[in-house]
């Protein structure tokens, strides 16, 4: 008897379930996507114990006919495709015919469904075996319940995380689906507690507000672009609103949420130097294209895709974001809080006052520029009173119930936008008092960000504080400028242009620089020797696994030659290519930082005025090359609000 045998259907389904049904979030994703494919306009998701105990999905879709109910739970049975040509024209979220049999094989499943023009069907399946099938009275749509997930695969249960983590995975999936299909009303409940409710009115910004908070929605920049092959729509946050994880960037392709690193990278590149290192924007991009240009049949989970015109798409995304930011003044506002916020902060301040010891009063120095008095030759330090006590800052900790264990969340402790964002709201806005009707009204009242150009307005210097911060004014209010960041931006654009124009000339090193590599690294660098010569770097083999460098391109910053060479070697080893544009940009950043004025350096009034005027001539006067803000704005209204001139 031969050793090779055909597996029975039940065992095959258990094996397939290992790829399709990894955790409760996988079940929710597959069932909700089925509901959307069935033209549902309203979907309810009910969970118990993060789905490990019970998952129930109720929709008002087309339903399943009685004769199709049994077939639907057979492997590779689907209504979405008929022949191989349909694989290249997929518009539905599901098409493989694996989800239902895979889910049924590892759970106790109950299905009640009706097409509306005939009696409904009641089906009970346990571990892939049909226990009961009967007709029943039912409204149009489908009600499917999955209980005791992985009851017959205890090994899989060992790999489940805590209830809090599994619930976080589910909410993450539901949020992505809500963003990709704003025309569908979604309700999410956990242990009978409502976590999310979207209206289904098609307004993506309202969905984003219910997920990330109304404060984030006020800082969204609309993105639109169209080419022969692609149509892009969506929203991204202003550079002042960032997170410590890429998890807040969502990419949708033909209505399907996908995880694609290169798309996220393109969004980051669209911001370029507007983002600080290690910070990422909140973004939502919906991309429509011919199904022939995207392969969604890459993985059973259908979260990964491949593009046939990837470079064209990435370039379109980058250019669209860059063009959008060029139309906006990117000056962060200090902001005035709402009445509700003021009340909350006053209570918090009282609490902190009772538990904190007041600090000794301090008298910081504020330097007035000499240009304000022609007879003065040196800056004068003038003592100015400050508030006698400040409540200590408290670090915010995210609720563990809705945060992935694998991710680190480190929100900024500084109020960087108009209304300080309480990041816990991004996970449960409805609990924070946002009823759906109130949310709709608030979203309607959001003013579109003005697209009237990004030129920095004229600024008139007032003074300098601690030799580090410049105070300036105009008819819009008060501006605080970081003098080092301002000159760093000016110098960066100067060196960037200078380095970019340099010819391929080389300069000899006084002492040859030796590079020792592993065998794998040596072979990769050896493959790129000709490319390195084209950019002016000549390597000579020295020993078995080493090279020596006798000269370098003249555009290398003085004193940083070996750092740039090491950077080039690292690029070759990792990327198997030399990105000369990136190297030159990093060299320009290095040179600009070293050449800029530092903190505690006092300037005359003429020097301050010249610095501000030169800053206005740059292409991006809002952030330094590292992404830090250059200036912050206090509007006249905000100042009047502080001093109770307006109530």
Curated annotation (Swiss-Prot):
InterPro entries xrefs: DNA_mismatch_repair_CS (IPR014762), DNA_mismatch_repair_MutL (IPR020667), DNA_mismatch_S5_2-like (IPR013507), HATPase_C_sf (IPR036890), MutL/Mlh/PMS (IPR002099), MutL/Mlh/Pms-like (IPR038973), MutL_C (IPR014790), MutL_C_dimsub (IPR042120)
Biased composition (Low complexity): 387-400
One of the record's GO cellular component terms: mismatch repair complex
Keyword DNA damage: yes
A GO biological-process term: mismatch repair
PROSITE patterns membership: DNA_MISMATCH_REPAIR_1 (PS00058)
Keywords tagged on the record: DNA damage, DNA repair
One MF annotation (Gene Ontology) recorded for this entry: mismatched DNA binding
Region described as Disordered: 375-433
Function as written in the Swiss-Prot or TrEMBL entry: This protein is involved in the repair of mismatches in DNA. It is required for dam-dependent methyl-directed DNA mismatch repair. May act as a 'molecular matchmaker', a protein that promotes the formation of a stable complex between two or more DNA-binding proteins in an ATP-dependent manner without itself being part of a final effector complex.
Family, per entry: Belongs to the DNA mismatch repair MutL/HexB family.
Protein name, UniProt field: DNA mismatch repair protein MutL
Organism whose genome encodes this protein: Bacillus cereus (strain AH820)
Gene: mutL
């Amino acid at each position: 008897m031969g050793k090779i045998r055909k597996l029975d259907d039940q065992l095959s389904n258990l094996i397939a379930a290992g790829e399709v049904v990894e955790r409760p979030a996988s079940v929710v994703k597959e069932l909700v996507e089925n509901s959307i494919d069935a033209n549902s306009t309203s979907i309810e998701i009910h969970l118990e114990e993060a789905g490990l105990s019970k998952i129930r999905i109720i929709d008002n879709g087309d339903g399943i006919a009685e004769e199709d109910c049994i077939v639907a739970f057979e492997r590779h049975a689907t209504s979405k495709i008929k022949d191989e040509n349909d694989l290249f024209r997929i518009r539905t979220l599901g098409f493989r015919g694996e989800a239902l049999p895979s889910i049924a094989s590892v759970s106790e499943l109950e299905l009640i469904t009706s097409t509306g023009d005939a009696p409904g069907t009641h089906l009970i399946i346990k571990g892939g075996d049909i226990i009961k099938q009967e007709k029943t009275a039912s409204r149009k749509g489908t009600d499917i319940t999955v209980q005791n997930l992985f009851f017959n695969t205890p090994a899989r249960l060992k790999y489940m995380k805590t209830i809090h983590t599994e619930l976080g995975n589910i909410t993450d999936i539901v949020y992505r689906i809500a963003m990709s299909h704003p025309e569908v009303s979604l309700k999410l409940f956990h242990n009978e507690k409502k976590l999310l409710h979207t209206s289904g009115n098609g307004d993506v910004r309202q969905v984003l507000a219910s997920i990330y908070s109304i404060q984030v929605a006020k800082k969204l920049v609309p993105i639109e672009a169209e080419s022969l092959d692609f149509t892009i729509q969506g929203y991204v946050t202003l550079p002042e609103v960032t997170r410590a994880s890429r998890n807040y960037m969502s990419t949708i392709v033909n209505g399907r949420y996908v995880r694609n690193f290169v798309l996220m990278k393109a969004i980051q590149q669209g911001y370029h130097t507007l983002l600080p290192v290690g910070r990422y924007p909140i973004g939502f991009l919906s991309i429509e294209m011919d199904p022939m240009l995207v392969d969604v049949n890459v993985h059973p989970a259908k979260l990964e895709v491949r593009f046939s015109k990837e470079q064209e798409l990435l370039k379109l995304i980058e250019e669209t974001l860059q063009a959008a930011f060029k139309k906006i003044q990117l000056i962060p506002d200090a902001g005035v809080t709402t009445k509700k916020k003021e009340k909350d902060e006053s209570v918090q301040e009282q609490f902190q006052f009772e538990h904190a010891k007041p600090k000794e009063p301090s008298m910081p120095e504020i330097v007035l520029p000499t240009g304000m008095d022609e007879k003065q030759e040196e800056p004068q330090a003038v003592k100015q009173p400050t508030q006698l006590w400040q409540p200590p800052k408290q670090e915010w900790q995210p609720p563990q119930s809705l945060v992935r264990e694998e991710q680190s969340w480190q929100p900024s402790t500084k109020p960087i936008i108009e209304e300080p964002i309480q990041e816990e709201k991004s996970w449960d806005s409805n609990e924070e008092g946002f009823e759906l009707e109130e949310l709709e009204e608030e979203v309607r009242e959001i003013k579109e960000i003005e697209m009237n150009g990004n030129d920095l307005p004229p600024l008139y210097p007032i003074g300098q504080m601690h030799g580090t911060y410049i105070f300036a004014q105009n008819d819009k209010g008060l501006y605080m400028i970081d003098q080092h960041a301002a000159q760093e931006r000016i110098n960066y654009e100067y060196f960037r242009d200078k380095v970019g124009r340099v010819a391929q000339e080389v300069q000899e090193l006084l002492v040859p620089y030796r590079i020792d590599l592993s065998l794998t690294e040596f072979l990769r660098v050896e493959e790129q020797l000709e490319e390195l010569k084209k950019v002016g770097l000549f390597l000579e083999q020295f020993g078995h696994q080493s090279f020596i460098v006798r000269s370098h391109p003249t555009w290398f910053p003085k004193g940083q030659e070996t750092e740039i060479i090491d950077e080039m070697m690292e690029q070759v080893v990792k990327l198997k290519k030399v990105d000369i544009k990136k190297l030159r940009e990093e060299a320009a950043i290095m040179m600009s930082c070293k050449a800029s004025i530092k903190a505690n350096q006092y300037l005359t009034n003429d020097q301050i005025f010249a610095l501000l005027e030169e800053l206005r001539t740059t292409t991006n006067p809002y952030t330094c090359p590292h992404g830090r803000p250059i200036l912050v704005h206090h509007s006249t209204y905000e100042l009047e609000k502080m001093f109770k001139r307006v109530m």
